[in-house]
Each structure stands twice: as structure tokens, then as C-alpha cells.
Amino acid sequence: MHIVICIKQVPDSAQIRVDPVTNTIMRQGVPTIINPYDLFALEERSSCASHGGEVTVLTMGPPMAEDALRKALTVADRAVLLTERHFAGSDTLATSFALSRAIAKIGEAFGTPDIVFTAKQTIDGDTAQVGPGIAKRLDLLQLTYVAKIVSVDINGREITVERRSEGGTQTLMSKLPCLITMLEGTNEIRRGSLDDALRAARSQIVKWNAADAGIEDLTKCGLRGSPTVVKRVFAPPERAEKAEQIDTAEKTPRDLAEELIAGIFLRSGVESELAFDAN
């Protein structure tokens, strides 16, 4: 079994700043992390590990994205970094194109993947479009918003998963190969062992440019291949509302209700004329 996991190095959302002049995210000097939803994909690969095989992690980004791959290598066998200036400024369409070509090349070099994992979305873009875009380009069955891998039948070429939706949880079965987009799952995120960390530090990362990944049409990459235009990025204004705690000591339920209702009307600027019946 061969598993490919797409990850992304993103700015730590707790420390993101917006340039007031360009209205874009200021990435310089902001700590980076592995996209949190990618961690669940890395963890779920253990559900398939009993069948043997290999795990390849893939990311597209600048040379500094190697740091994220080093961390992911603690639970993977190899890492591929897709990096070149032609990829800069890619939107979801251009990103899914480049990653799909890289996955196809990974299949040629290391074996066709049985499962491709992506996060449901990244915390810097929040589009949830790249995973389905890859599946479409590679003609893969796709299982989205998956919370758990239930079972894998490698002989029968089937996988069963739990998918979370607004209506509840669904149990779905799919044929392999397929693409899975992961959201926060039920498994706890575990750290690799010290031996895993040492192995990851010594491992050689495969670095590909566009030509290495089999990309011939550069007009589909980067800004030239990105029809999406972001006009403005901004932080929402701070909300003036604050929580207020009501002291319940030695107060009757009626007193508490009256105080609560009075507070609601006071905040809305409307005078309350409601009164409780003494009975």
C-alpha cells in the first residue's frame, strides 16, 4: 500500500498580522506551523499502517517549507518538496494542478498511491477546494470531511470511513484508489519517537521543480494560472460586547430572571416594561 499525504506550512493563526497598506497577510517574521488539519491526516495513516507499504508526504512551497516536511517525516517514509518561483502566488486552481501533477509523478517514481490524503482545508485559505480539485484532475473517487478511517481491505480494494456532516455521522465505503479530505478526528495527535526524529533529520528530502514534476505548461502555475484575485484581507474589528456574570447568591429565580431580562433590554436600548406576576 502506498499513501500520499499533502501538507502545507501555514502562518500561526494566533500571530497573523495584516499589512495596512497592501491589505495582505504579513508572513515575514510570523512563526509557521503544519496546517492543523494535516496533522489528523498524518495520524490517520496509522490506521492503514497494518497493511504495510509506504507513506510519502508532499508539499508545495518555498524552500523553508522543508521544516514542515522534516516534522512530517517522523511518521512518513519519504518527503517531496515542490518548489520553484513559478509556483508563487498560486490560487486553489493552480495549486491543485501542480499537486496533481506531482502526485502522478510520485506514482511513476515510487508506486501508484492507493490513498491520497489532504486536509479538509487550510487555516490560511479556508477554501476546502484543493483536495477535491486534485481528485478531479486525477480522476479519483473522493471522500470529504472524514473524521475516522474505520477499516481498509487491501485485498478487496475497499476502504470504510466515518464522514461528519451537518446531519450527523455517515459511514461510507469506497473503492481504492481514492482521495480523502480529513477534518479533526477522534484519534489523538501523537508525536514521533526520538528515533523517528533522528531519522527524519537525516533523511534526504526529494526536491522537484516544475520540470521534475512533469509540468510543461507553466501558464497553469502560479499567478498566471490563478484566476482568483484577492482584493483585500483584513482583521475583523473587535467586538464591544462583553460577558457579564450575574451573582446568584441569595437571589430567587424570579429576581434572577428580572435582572437578566432588564440587562438584555438595557443593552438593546429599550426600556423594559415587563413585570412578573407575584404568583
Swiss-Prot record:
Stored InterPro entries: ET-Flavoprotein_bsu_CS (IPR000049), ETF_a/b_N (IPR014730), ETF_b (IPR012255), ETF_beta_N (IPR033948), Rossmann-like_a/b/a_fold (IPR014729)
GO MF, any single term: electron transfer activity
A biological process from GO: nitrogen fixation
SS bond partners: none
Keyword annotations of the record: Electron transport, Nitrogen fixation, Transport
CDD domains listed in its UniProt record: ETF_beta
Electron transport found in the keyword field: yes
Keyword DNA-binding: no
PANTHER family found in the cross-reference section: ELECTRON TRANSFER FLAVOPROTEIN BETA-SUBUNIT, PROTEIN FIXA
Family: Belongs to the ETF beta-subunit/FixA family.
Complexes and interactors: FixA and FixB form a heterodimer.
Stated role: May play a role in a redox process involved in nitrogen fixation.
Protein's name in the database: Protein FixA
The organism of origin for this protein: Rhizobium leguminosarum bv. phaseoli
